[in-house]
């Protein structure tokens, strides 16, 4: 079963912008954490879609972030392991690290195909699907 799409994307701000629009940025709530390893301050916590949209430029300056997407008015779950993610209300989870590596997990296979296609069309490097057989990640943090 498909779990994610991983890739290297230059120009993080542009990548974030496109990912957020492809996944309906304003139609969801977002939770940003795992930002403590950065040289630039970014507020950890819950964001409306509009708040996150306005913070994309600052977000792109980070080296590490975990961004989770939730349906509106949903409680934020504790997600440590992949199993927690699967059992949570979170429908997508983006791990961004080292300033250009992205792992986009989604429970919606169509979303994964859309992001993969977009990545290929826009020259993302090392783009690949992550599935049950090749996903080595169990811990959904850095």
Residue locations for each model-derived region?
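Acidic, proline/glycine-rich low-complexity IDRs
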Residues: 96-142
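Short, surface-exposed beta-edge/turn micro-motifs
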Residues: 28, 90-92, 99-102
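Generic structural motif
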Residues: 10, 35, 70-73, 99, ...
């Amino acid at each position: 079963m498909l779990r994610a799409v991983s890739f290297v994307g230059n120009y993080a701000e542009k990548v974030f912008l496109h990912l957020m629009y492809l996944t309906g940025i304003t139609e969801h709530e977002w939770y940003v954490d795992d930002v403590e390893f950065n040289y630039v301050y970014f507020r950890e916590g819950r964001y409306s879609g509009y708040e996150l949209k306005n913070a994309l430029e600052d977000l792109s300056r980070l080296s590490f972030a975990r961004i989770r997407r939730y349906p509106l008015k949903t409680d934020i779950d504790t997600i440590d392991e992949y199993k927690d993610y699967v059992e949570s209300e979170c429908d997508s989870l983006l791990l961004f690290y080292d300033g250009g590596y992205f792992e986009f997990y989604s429970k919606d296979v169509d979303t994964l195909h859309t992001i993969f296609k977009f990545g290929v069309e826009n020259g993302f490097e090392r783009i690949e699907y992550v599935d049950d057989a090749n996903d080595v990640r169990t811990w959904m943090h850095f």
